Amino acid sequence: MYVCLCQGVTDNQIRDAIYEGCCSYREVREATGVGTQCGKCACLAKQVVRETLNDLQSAQPVPAFGTTAFVAA
């Protein structure tokens, strides 16, 4: 869906910017142009950023202790 009509930015483009390394709304704004014209989309854009970052964080695997084998040289 379109989040920013002024710049033609979709929620998928915002998510893609995060998947490509953006870690904040500010970085997404700089990468996509979302929220740089009238600003009415900023709240929704921030929500998409927040939800996507939370989804990524919860999807990160947590390493279990004792599962890594070290080989002595």
UniProtKB/Swiss-Prot annotation:
The protein, known as: Bacterioferritin-associated ferredoxin
Cofactor: [2Fe-2S] cluster; phosphate
Result of altering R29E: Probably unstable, it cannot be overexpressed, in truncated protein
Phenotype upon gene inactivation: No growth phenotype in iron-sufficient conditions, in low iron conditions iron accumulates in BFR composed only of BfrB, the iron is not mobilizable, increased secretion of pyoverdin siderophore.
Result, substituting K46E: Probably unstable, it cannot be overexpressed, in truncated protein
This protein's domain notes: The C-terminal 17 residues are not required for [2Fe-2S] cluster assembly, interaction with the BfrB bacterioferritin complex (BFR) or iron mobilization from the BfrB core.
Pfam families in the record: Fer2_BFD
Transmembrane regions: none
GO molecular function annotations of the record: 2 iron, 2 sulfur cluster binding; metal ion binding
Binding positions for phosphate per the UniProt entry: R26, R29, K46
Documented effect of changing L5A: 2-fold decreased iron release from BfrB, 25-fold decreased affinity for BfrB
Induction summary: Increased transcription under iron starvation.
Binding, [2Fe-2S] cluster: C4, C6, C38, C41
